[in-house]
Curated annotation (Swiss-Prot):
Residues the record lists as binding Ca(2+) 1: 52, 54, 56, 58, 60, 63
Stored InterPro entries: EF-hand-dom_pair (IPR011992), EF_Hand_1_Ca_BS (IPR018247), EF_hand_dom (IPR002048), Parvalbumin (IPR008080)
Organism: Callorhinchus milii (Ghost shark)
Official protein name in the record: Parvalbumin alpha
Every EF-hand domain range: 39-74, 78-110
Function text: In muscle, parvalbumin is thought to be involved in relaxation after contraction. It binds two calcium ions.
Lineage summary: Eukaryota, Metazoa, Chordata, Craniata, Vertebrata
Stored Pfam families: EF-hand_7 (PF13499)
Thermal dependence, as annotated: Thermostable between pH 4.0-9.5. Average melting temperature (Tm) across all pH values is 71 degrees Celsius. Lower melting temperature in acidic pH 4.0-5.0.
Residues at which Ca(2+) 2 binds: 91, 93, 95, 97, 102
Gene3D superfamilies documented for this protein: EF-hand
Family: Belongs to the parvalbumin family.
Length: 110
């Protein structure tokens, strides 16, 4: 499934523009700007599986680093700090990766 079947390409482009600068990424603001916060759990789960590029059932640190590129090719890589901050925010059980239920909760808490 394409991310643009779930979220507006215009909203994604606007949000990516907001976070172009290094260390400017705020996942709460990003999820709100792209409209993910308003989506139901099924749609949020579908986005999770798009972000889980290796289909492991988890979003690992290396996938988080390039998470913005999953929304649009012009997205940038997150800095190491941004990546760690996002992982810390979403990794409720401390296993170093974000599972689908953790991702749904991360979006809900944004």
């Amino acid at each position: 499934m394409s991310i643009n079947k779930i979220l507006s390409a215009a909203d994604i482009t606007k949000a990516l523009g907001e976070f172009k600068g290094a260390d400017s990424f705020d996942h709460k603001k990003f999820f709100h700007m792209i409209g993910l916060k308003k989506k139901n759990a099924k749609d949020v789960e579908a986005v999770f599986y798009i972000l889980d590029k290796d289909k492991s059932g988890f979003i690992e640190e290396d996938e988080l680093k390039s998470v913005l590129k999953c929304f649009a090719p012009e997205g940038r890589d997150l800095s190491e700090k941004e990546t760690k901050d996002l992982l810390t925010a979403g990794d409720e059980d401390g296993d170093g990766k974000i599972g689908v239920s953790e991702f749904i909760q991360l979006v809900a808490n944004s």
